[in-house]
């Protein structure tokens, strides 16, 4: 089997890692071994936190909807149940935005949910 010297490929692989590590502090952006560990960890955190972000935003929306629905005399669960009974298909993101930006509109939606009880 012929010998493979890998000069170009090895340099390209190292440069790819060091490019991803750009902006890291100290040796983590300069030395290949440190940069590899830092980049691996950063990519793992990024992957994990893309999932966590969805959970966090849903929790924030639910908190905002709950606060606004309690101002209208309903709990969050009763509001959601009433909206499902009334066949109002507004998702939590839009409901939370309404609760913050348009309280009157939200209270009209809450009255729709109240009418189901």
From Swiss-Prot:
Function: Binds directly to 23S ribosomal RNA and is necessary for the in vitro assembly process of the 50S ribosomal subunit. It is not involved in the protein synthesizing functions of that subunit.
A biological process term (GO) from this entry: ribosomal large subunit assembly
Lineage start: Bacteria, Pseudomonadati, Thermodesulfobacteriota, Desulfuromonadia, Geobacterales
Pfam families for this protein: Ribosomal_L20
UniProt record similarity statement: Belongs to the bacterial ribosomal protein bL20 family.
Coiled-coil ranges from the UniProt annotation: none
Protein name: Large ribosomal subunit protein bL20
GO molecular function: rRNA binding; structural constituent of ribosome
Gene designation per UniProt: rplT
PANTHER family in the cross-refs: 39S RIBOSOMAL PROTEIN L20
Keyword entries, A-Z: Ribonucleoprotein, Ribosomal protein, RNA-binding, rRNA-binding
InterPro entries: Ribosomal_bL20, RIBOSOMAL_L20_CS, Ribosomal_protein_bL20_C
Record NCBIfam families: rplT_bact
One of the record's GO cellular component terms: cytosolic large ribosomal subunit
Keyword Calcium: no
HAMAP family on file: Ribosomal_bL20 (MF_00382)
Metal-binding recorded as keyword: no
């Amino acid at each position: 089997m012929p010998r493979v010297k890998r000069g170009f490929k090895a340099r390209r692989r190292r440069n790819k890692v060091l490019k991803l590590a750009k902006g890291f502090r100290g040796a983590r952006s300069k030395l290949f071994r440190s940069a590899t560990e830092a980049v691996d960890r950063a990519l793992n955190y990024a992957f994990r936190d893309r999932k966590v972000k969805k959970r966090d935003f849903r929790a924030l929306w639910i908190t905002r909807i709950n606060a606004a629905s309690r101002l209208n005399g309903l709990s969050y669960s009763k509001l959601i149940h009433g909206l499902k009974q009334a066949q109002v298909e507004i998702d939590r993101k839009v409901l939370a935005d309404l609760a913050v930006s348009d309280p009157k509109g939200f209270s009209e939606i809450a009255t729709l949910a109240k009418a189901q009880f």
